[in-house]
Amino acid sequence: MASLLLTSSSMITTSCRSMVLRSGLPIGSSFPSLRLTRPYDKATLFVSCCSAESKKVATSATDLKPIMERRPEYIPNKLPHKNYVRVLDTTLRDGEQSPGAALTPPQKLEIARQLAKLRVDIMEVGFPVSSEEEFEAIKTIAKTVGNEVDEETGYVPVICGIARCKKRDIEATWEALKYAKRPRVMLFTSTSEIHMKYKLKKTKEEVIEMAVNSVKYAKSLGFKDIQFGCEDGGRTEKDFICKILGESIKAGATTVGFADTVGINMPQEFGELVAYVIENTPGADDIVFAIHCHNDLGVATANTISGICAGARQVEVTINGIGERSGNAPLEEVVMALKCRGESLMDGVYTKIDSRQIMATSKMVQEHTGMYVQPHKPIVGDNCFVHESGIHQDGILKNRSTYEILSPEDVGIVKSENSGIVLGKLSGRHAVKDRLKELGYEISDEKFNDIFSRYRELTKDKKRITDADLKALVVNGAEISSEKLNSKGINDLMSSPQISAVV
């Protein structure tokens, strides 16, 4: 373990530059020395894509007990370790801005409770000034979820509300959140030339004054945890970002950062921008730096990872990546990327998310918003841990790691040994015979040749072969045609179940 520790700035710079090279960024990128360390005991942290913790038996995500590890003291502007990444989930604010994704107050509360099970550091739960119903929903979350402290671990989420740099916004946010144990206000204003000219109609100096006055006002109301962010930071002059963030820090902000609001940045330029801003913002060593990426060009996850590699230590994400237009960086993708490659490729950056709650959270958000993910959506799609190709199925049956870099149990999917196998026209003999054995049939080689031949015929008519189809092939023999197997009378064919037949 000692040989893995990074003990000098020069060593870390070399490591980061090696990582930049492997990720396609130029060697000359101005990544700062991050002074990363690994304070944890390697045996208690996930050191590969598949964790030992995920192997514990459970029937559903709700059966999984929280990982009982004492949380360090929460200090708004300080991290427990340089390589710890805070996760701010904004499903209940930015996610709800997805067209058609409006949530009722009870739904928001239920999702907030599930986010707490997921162990997000901060949950941004809405825009208090926007309506009376929104205000009351946020206040309810602050009073309940915001005060539910886990006595064993000390965990309680930070409850955050967003506010423009306007007094009435800040006042409404304080009134809604003051009941929480850890309230935070998320202040923002536009900083790009196009936004300042056409939206705000203000000069740079006026925008800086707005930001500074808002931070000071939030502090005067009682906020000790104050975040300031640049809207449309991805199209803002980098020196202006440094200037306004530096002034916000001086005024009392504890977390600062910027958003790629329109999703225009590419991973290389985004990482370089983050590195430049951290390196050149006065007071950056005294705060936590945050990033917020949108997915208009399909690179929100990549940009978020690039930003982390450049020194950002708070990521703003949503469940399933829902959000304005094409959405935000998905929490599940960012978290599992860090869990899978954070140790080996990114100098040990990590989160405290209980990834075993990911699937349950994803399903809940899908149900409540009506926004269902595509089957091949990374991490939470129905096909993520499913294999149909015969070559892949053969490998999976021998050892799951041949074609799976993550364990399904890591994200809360409880599977039997071979339940990731889907039978179809690409499936091979090994997978079909193995499934028949699972169903209780010991098939002779001669009989199996006949069954497999008819199985092939059946796949011409059906995209996926079910257990009922397989049972019919065994029980009824050659006289059962594929046409009959596809008929509504399939259950009639299976009137006498075969539990442990020898054919």
From Swiss-Prot:
- EC number(s) given by UniProt: 2.3.3.17
Variant or mutagenesis effect after changing V156A: In strain: cv. Ka-0, cv. Lip-0, cv. No-0, cv. Sei-0, cv. Tsu-1 and cv. Wl-0
Subcellular location(s): the record lists: Plastid, Chloroplast
Q: Where is the Pyruvate carboxyltransferase domain?
A: 85-359
Please, one GO biological process term?
glucosinolate biosynthetic process
Tell me which cofactor or cofactors this protein depends on.
Mn(2+)
Major place of localization?
A: plastid
Task: Identify one Gene Ontology CC term for this UniProt entry.
Answer: chloroplast
| Organelle transit peptide | 1-51
Q: Summarize how pH affects activity.
A: Optimum pH is 8.0.
Q: In which tissues is it expressed?
A: Highly expressed in roots, leaves, and siliques. Lower amounts in stems and flowers.
One short Pfam name that applies is: HCS_D2
Q: What is the top EC class of this enzyme, as a single word? A: transferase
Q: What is the effect of changing G24A?
A: In strain: cv. Sorbo
Relate the outcome reported for changing I241L: In strain: cv. Bl-0, cv. Di-G, cv. Ka-0, cv. Landsberg erecta, cv. Lip-0, cv. No-0, cv. Petergof, cv. Sei-0, cv. Tsu-1 and cv. Wl-0
CDD domains in the cross-refs: DRE_TIM_IPMS
Alphabetical UniProt keywords: Chloroplast, Plastid, Transferase, Transit peptide
The free-text function statement in the UniProt record for this protein reads: Determines the side chain length of aliphatic glucosinolate structures. Accepts all the omega-methylthio-2-oxoalkanoic acids needed to form the known C3 to C8 glucosinolates. Also able to convert pyruvate to citramalate, 2-oxoisovalerate to isopropylmalate, 4-methyl-2-oxopentanoate and 5-methyl-2-oxohexanoate for Leu-derived glucosinolates, 3-methyl-2-oxopentanoate for Ile-derived glucosinolates and phenylpyruvate to phenylethylglucosinolate.
| Entry protein name | Methylthioalkylmalate synthase 3, chloroplastic
